[in-house]
Amino acid sequence: MTTRTETAAYESHHTAPRDARDTDRTMPLATVRTLAASAHVGDLVFIRVPAKAPRDAAGATGSTGAWANRFGIVVDTSGDEPVIAESAFAWTKLMPLSRFVARTDGGRIALARRVAAPTTDAQRQIHSTAERRIDALLGNRFNLRTRRGFCADYVSDVLGADRDATPAALLRSDTLSLEFDGIVFDPGRPS
């Protein structure tokens, strides 16, 4: 048996820019369980839900990195799987990660974490704000007034982003570090 040592000539690959996220590159794979194990309270989970209404299509096409049209915030990791808070018409819905992931088009998920603030005092203040927002949401699950606008308030107060920021704009922001961007599947779920 002979060993093949020659290689085809190719151009070197350069690192893709931060906003080059909707490419045809090979995506990493993960299960819902491994994604759940790496999720922390305060993380943002991005998905693409097929557009059903004109408001669903907003920000879905056009600029690079606009593949995501929905995001949720991890608000609890104490149970079997993380609980995701997602903005809905009139209030915030709470659902398990597996149900949130099951809605995605093509299985693509991005998990992003807030970048640490530059000073210890700023880190404490942001962490305290995030905890207050999440505690108010979870402590008043049946108070619709408290549940209204949670995601927009969280994005504004904790991430310092505009209340009306699109998921694509949040993904490209410098306030988040991308922990996972790939395809997530649930082996227990029929295809």
PLM-predicted stretches and their roles:
Residues 38, 124-128, 133, 185-190:
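Short secondary-structure transition/capping segments
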Residues 54-57, 107-168:
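Active-site nucleophile-His-acid catalytic modules used for acyl/amide transfer and hydrolysis
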Residues 7, 24-26, 32, 94, ...:
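Generic N-terminal initiation segments characterized by hydrophobic and/or small/turn-forming residues
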Residues 2-79:
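N-terminal accessory segments that precede or flank the first globular/catalytic domain
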Residues 47-113, 140-149:
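Glycine-rich catalytic cores of cysteine/serine-nucleophile enzymes that process amide/ester linkages
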